Amino acid sequence: MLDTEPDLSTRLFSHIDFTHGAVAAVSGGSDSTALLLLLKHHFDRTGSSAKLLAVTIDHGLRQGSAAEAQAVAKLCAERGIAHRTLTWTGRKPSTGLPAAARDARYHLLAEAARAEGIGLIVTGHTADDQAETVLMRHARDRELADLAGRGLAGMAPATLYDWREWIVRPLLGTRRSALRDFLRREHVGWAEDPTNIDEAFERPRVRAALAGESAGHMENTLRLAGQAAVERGQLGASAANLIRRIASQPSTGLIRLDPALLIADDQAAIYALRILLATAGGAAFLPDQARSAALFVRLKAGFLCATLSRTVVDFRHAGLFLRREARGLPPAATAVDNTIWDGRRHITLNDMSGALLIAPLGAAAARRLAIDDGETPASLIRAALAAEPTLLQAFENLGLPQGEPRLPVFAARPVVSPFARFLPSFDLAPARAVAELIGASPLPASPLGGHSAD
């Protein structure tokens, strides 16, 4: 059911934990302005002492953006709300501008949140935005309807950014027209961004087409998204259960899958395999559904060695093993603290006294490691360790206990690659299962009631 008259009722914010404050992303448009005022009303009504910080991102892409940011600052000053304006600086891409602007926006919002010790970012995405997103994804790939709703689920009510800050969208059930009615009752205006009607971009084209449809079309699209979200969550839960049953990590960088995977439900098994392939290979996106399904069929036929998503798939008597392929590993480069290496490892430097070079361990160094023979072939362990990061100047003094590259001057913690940047709440279950498997950092608790990572 769509919310058509937003107010201070509990339906909008009562399920969100604001204990540690919130950063509200406010552009000055109607949706984000209404969100800000609704949040302010909620904080005042509940007597919350937590900080509400409005942040406006000036992308610097058109005239008038600075004036709009100033208008937001003025409104915040009038309403007693803390406000900051952050600017997207540097060169802008000639293609893919909307995506680049989105990435820059979330990066700046996260920086602002971290500076205040706030782990929650709230955005004003509406039911209209959700319908547009679903239609855009459907138009891009007609096969999405057969993929248990992964894309057709649209935007998640919450998304974990960089495995640290939660981005929450409390207005996904609220129409833009209702928000504007609310602002009129408050006697508050808003800015109109001309790019929102510039049909040179995909979203404005979809928005224009949707405006010509009946209200029933909007309702049906959102109903589709809701059903797809349920199916995506169910598939993720099945995949998570499967990962916990059949996956293990005999050595750093090496995942073993029990052949029981091949007799499990095909849909859950293929989804679990895709997530693990992307994680082992350090890929930001899951491998292609069709190619993954074809690989699954080949695995059912017997032993093989193949590559997909930068991952070597080695099926032999000892089990089904996944590891990063040697091709395309990062070249030696200066180590930078708090960065992601090869899409797979979060690098933390414990010694900042001088420049350090980080590089893959390499096959030659891996061959010198003393590895006890066990259930897992030593050759597989060495191949996996060869793709792990180490310091160039430390090759002769690795001192690696149990064959694992651990140096006191730096730490390399695994990350769940396909979910490391954006983790939709739909996918919490498989993300947590993989994090437990590979030893990634635990997931921070979701601020939404009823959204568990279990």
Swiss-Prot record:
UniProt KW keywords: ATP-binding, Cytoplasm, Ligase, Nucleotide-binding, tRNA processing
Q: What is this protein called?
A: tRNA(Ile)-lysidine synthase
Read off the InterPro entries from this record: Rossmann-like_a/b/a_fold, TilS/TtcA_N, tRNA_Ile_lys_synt, tRNA_Ile_lys_synt_N
Q: What is its EC number?
A: 6.3.4.19
Pfam families with a match to the protein in the record: ATP_bind_3
Q: What is known of its domains?
A: The N-terminal region contains the highly conserved SGGXDS motif, predicted to be a P-loop motif involved in ATP binding.
Q: Which PANTHER family match?
A: TRNA(ILE)-LYSIDINE SYNTHASE-RELATED
Gene3D superfamilies this protein is in? HUPs (3.40.50.620)
UniProt subcellular location:
Cytoplasm
Q: Which GO terms describe its molecular function?
A: ATP binding; tRNA(Ile)-lysidine synthase activity
Per the UniProt record, the source organism is Mesorhizobium japonicum (strain LMG 29417 / CECT 9101 / MAFF 303099)
Which purpose does this protein serve, as stated in its record?
Ligates lysine onto the cytidine present at position 34 of the AUA codon-specific tRNA(Ile) that contains the anticodon CAU, in an ATP-dependent manner. Cytidine is converted to lysidine, thus changing the amino acid specificity of the tRNA from methionine to isoleucine.
Q: Offer a single GO CC term for the protein.
A: cytoplasm
Chain positions recorded as ATP binding sites: 27-32
